[in-house]
Structures are given as C-alpha cells and as structure tokens.
C-alpha cells in the first residue's frame, strides 16, 4: 500500500525538521502604535548600543522579544537578569525558614496522554529510520510516531512538576509539618506559533527563565496564603520600579475552574503577565503520588491532611524587560549644543543596575593614575561591587561623552581619578540620578558605596 496524502505531509514535516528549518527570524507582531513607537525605538537602540540586548533589529521586535526564540540579552542584560533573580532568591528563599531550594532536570519522562503538547526530545536518527522506507503506509507512520512520542522525553514547560517530585523527601525534612515551600529558578520551554510558518507547521521552541515557588499548605488556610503571596509579590515588583503603578494584579481562573491571580506590567503596547499565582488544590499531589495517601499527608496541628498546592511562578526574562522600560527616561541635556538632543538614561534600581561604578582617569601621569584605579577596582570587587574599568579604554572620550555613555549603561556612580588624587587623595564622584559632582577622599569611597547599596536594598 502506497503512502497517501497524510503520510506524505508527515514525511515533509519530518524532512523540514531534520533540515534545521526554524521559520522567519523576526517573529510575527502587530505594528507599533504611533504613541509609543518613538520611545520604543529609542530604548531598543540604546539597549543594543549598550549591550543590554543582542541581535538584529528584526530579532528585537516586540513579538520576538516576548517569544523567547532568540538570545535577547547581551552582557549587561544578562547581568541585570542575574541581579533580578538574585533579589527574588533572597526575598523568597534566603530569608524564609520554611522555603527550601530544589533542582530538577530540563527533561521529563514522556507522557502517554494524547493531548500532551510538550516538546519531545527525539533523535534525528530515529526519524531517518522510517524515512528510509520510501513507501511506508499511513498506519505505519502513525504507529511509529506515536510510539516515538510515548518513549521519548519531553522538555519541561514549567518548574511545578519538578518541585512536586521533591515533595515527599522534603516533607520528611520538615517532620511533616505544614506549611512549607520549594523554590527553584530555571529555564522552561514553550511553543511559539508563527503565522508565516510553512504548511509543514513546524513550531519553534521559545525559552524563558522561570522563578518558581511551590507552597504546600493545609486547605483551610490556602486562601489566606494565596492572598499573602499576592500582596508580597506585587509589593516586591513595585519595590524596584520608577513607576510602581505600572505593576498591577487581576484575578483569573483556568479551564478547570481553579482560581488564581496574575501580576501585570503595563508596557507601551499593553499589559503583559509577568507572574502567575494559582491555587491548584490537592489534585496535583494525588496525581503525582497515586496509591497510598498517607505518604503525602502532612501535619496541620494534630490532623494529618493532604496539603493544597499553591504555585507562584514568575517570568524573569519578561521582568527584566519590564524594568528596562520602567527605568528608561528622556530628559533635557544641559550640555548639548542642540536643544533637540535629549539625555537618555536608564535609572535602574541600585540593586538591579549591572554596573555600580565606573573608574576613569583625568589629567596627570597616566601610569600612576591607572595604578590607582587598578587598586581601587580590586578593593571594590572584593566587596562585591561591580566596576567598569573605563581607565583601560584606549579611545579618548570627553567627560560629557563618558557621562552620557554611563547614564545609558545605568552606572550609578562614575569616579574620576586625577593628578589631584595623587597629591591629596581626592577623587571626583558623579551621581547618575542627580548628575551632581562632589569631591571625596579615595579612602571613603568603598564605605560610601557599601552603605549606599545596603540602604537601597532595605527601602
């Protein structure tokens, strides 16, 4: 029996996948509205020039940035995302005695559920094996592919199931006492549709960095805990924002009737969900651990109960993008000769800024000044303060150009070491936020920065 139209289409899809086709690189998006197009273009241009973003203009379209199909972030963007994840970890894990860190594999066991749409990990050789038969029947193709999907692993779409697998062991860790939580940060995968896709319907894989807390609580207190985490998470996002009101929340419900809430950031093109909270009930645990219910029961006072599962999952990548939009400002440039030129600055929160201080040299003996800067750099790095070594650059720039560059890089302070420093130890310190300059003794710089960053984190 020769293969029919369905088999031929299946073969074409397999060959297209094997050839490495990934569809258009720019994604599909609606055109930017006029009211925010200029500001968006200015921000994307700044983020490209200052290496917060990485990629071509097509790869940095709104839809492409949201899809997660490209390596969106450059070195400074990666550092910003790392700082955001670190703040999340401190808030949700480090300072909470009832939350424990867990880890799970990117690959999960395959599922026999017919509607499971998770991406599968399939060897190309397995596909080529059936394609070598030039005349397979439709039934043979279907049987082969169904068996392949059942036996192959799948890429995780969420961190929830990885945390559930750790539940029983961690229940023993806390002597079965409820409530407690399991936290993890990791990469998850999702399908990205494309209206310009070929008839083979090859779907691209999008990635996102997810920050997840799975909270196990008695059912009687689950609503109170969901409200607690909602308030906590909304305040946390607003803590680092220039415009806190751009972060908002709204109730939601899934197709199974389970209630939850979503936290949104108001981008110029509209609201996007950056974090989702769900009350999943006890069914997730019962499905993960079928059989003896007593193995998953925790202690609620004197009672043994199957806990309710609360899921708090945030998109760290989208959160990073939100803070870039939130911190971007266009202000008058008092140093510009043309009034039409505006000062562009990223006023990222001090805890999130990728670089805290930049070191540059002014007039004076170059070798000696660079030695001073090198010693200062080592001292600051030892105290966990990120530094930009501007003094090592070979291209000369004016102070005005340097300040403009550092404002766009969101550098909190710039330090100028001159011949005056060699004479009496005084350096010039400029603030990103106020643009004010002051003289400070070099021996006081470290303590000043440490106290400044500590106070910023406690606000």
From Swiss-Prot:
Record carries keyword NAD: no
Keywords attached to this entry: DNA replication, DNA-binding, Mitochondrion, Mitochondrion nucleoid, Transit peptide
Domain of life: Eukaryota
A Gene Ontology cellular-component term: mitochondrial nucleoid
CDD domains in the cross-refs: GlyRS-like_core, Pol_gamma_b_Cterm
A Pfam family of this chain: HGTP_anticodon
Record localization: Mitochondrion; Mitochondrion matrix, Mitochondrion nucleoid
Gene3D superfamilies: Anticodon-binding domain, Bira Bifunctional Protein, Domain 2
GO molecular function terms listed in the Swiss-Prot or TrEMBL record: DNA polymerase binding; DNA polymerase processivity factor activity; DNA-directed DNA polymerase activity; double-stranded DNA binding; identical protein binding
Quaternary structure and interacting proteins, as annotated: Heterotrimer composed of a catalytic subunit and a homodimer of accessory subunits (POLG:POLG2).
Record's protein name: DNA polymerase subunit gamma-2
Lineage: Eukaryota, Metazoa, Chordata, Craniata, Vertebrata
């Amino acid at each position: 029996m020769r293969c029919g139209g369905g088999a031929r289409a299946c073969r074409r899809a397999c060959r297209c996948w094997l050839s490495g086709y990934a569809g258009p690189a720019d994604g599909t998006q609606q055109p930017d509205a006029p009211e925010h197009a200029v500001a968006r273009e200015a921000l994307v241009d700044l983020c490209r020039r200052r290496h917060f973003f990485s990629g071509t203009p097509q790869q940095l379209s709104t839809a492409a940035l949201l899809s997660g199909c490209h390596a969106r972030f450059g070195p400074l963007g990666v550092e910003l995302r790392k700082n955001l994840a670190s703040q999340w970890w401190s808030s949700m894990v480090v300072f909470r005695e009832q939350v424990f860190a867990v880890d799970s594999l990117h690959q999960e066991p395959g599922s026999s559920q017919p509607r499971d749409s998770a991406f599968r990990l399939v060897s190309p050789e397995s596909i080529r094996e059936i394609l070598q038969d030039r005349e397979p029947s439709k039934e043979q193709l279907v049987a082969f592919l169904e068996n392949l999907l059942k036996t192959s692993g799948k890429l995780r779409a969420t961190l929830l199931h990885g945390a559930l697998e750790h539940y029983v062991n961690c229940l023993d860790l806390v002597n079965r006492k409820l409530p407690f939580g399991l936290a993890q940060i990791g990469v998850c995968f999702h399908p990205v549709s494309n209206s310009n896709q070929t008839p083979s319907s090859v779907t691209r894989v999008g990635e996102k960095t997810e920050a997840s807390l799975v909270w196990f609580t008695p059912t009687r207190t689950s609503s109170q805990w969901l409200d607690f985490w909602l308030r906590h998470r909304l305040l946390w996002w607003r803590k680092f924002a220039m415009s806190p009101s751009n972060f908002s929340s709204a109730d939601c419900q899934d197709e199974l009737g389970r209630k939850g809430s979503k936290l949104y950031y108001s981008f110029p093109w509209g609201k996007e969900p950056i974090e989702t909270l769900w009350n999943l009930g006890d069914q997730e645990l019962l499905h993960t651990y079928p059989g003896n219910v007593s193995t998953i029961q925790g202690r609620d006072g004197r009672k043994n109960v199957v806990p309710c599962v609360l899921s708090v999952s945030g998109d760290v990548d989208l959160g990073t993008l939100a803070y870039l939009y939130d911190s971007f400002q266009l202000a008058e440039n008092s140093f510009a000769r043309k009034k039409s030129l505006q000062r562009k600055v990223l006023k990222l929160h001090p805890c999130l800024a990728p670089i805290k201080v930049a070191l540059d040299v002014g007039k004076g003996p170059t070798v000696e000044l660079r030695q001073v800067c090198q010693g200062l750099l080592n001292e600051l790095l030892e105290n966990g303060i990120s530094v930009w070594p501007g003094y090592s650059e070979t291209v000369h720039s004016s102070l005005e150009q340097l300040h403009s560059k550092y404002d766009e890089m969101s550098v909190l302070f710039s330090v100028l070491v001159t011949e005056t420093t060699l004479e009496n130890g005084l350096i010039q310190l400029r603030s990103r936020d106020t643009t004010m300059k002051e003289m400070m003794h070099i021996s006081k710089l470290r303590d000043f920065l440490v106290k400044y960053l500590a106070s910023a984190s406690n606000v």
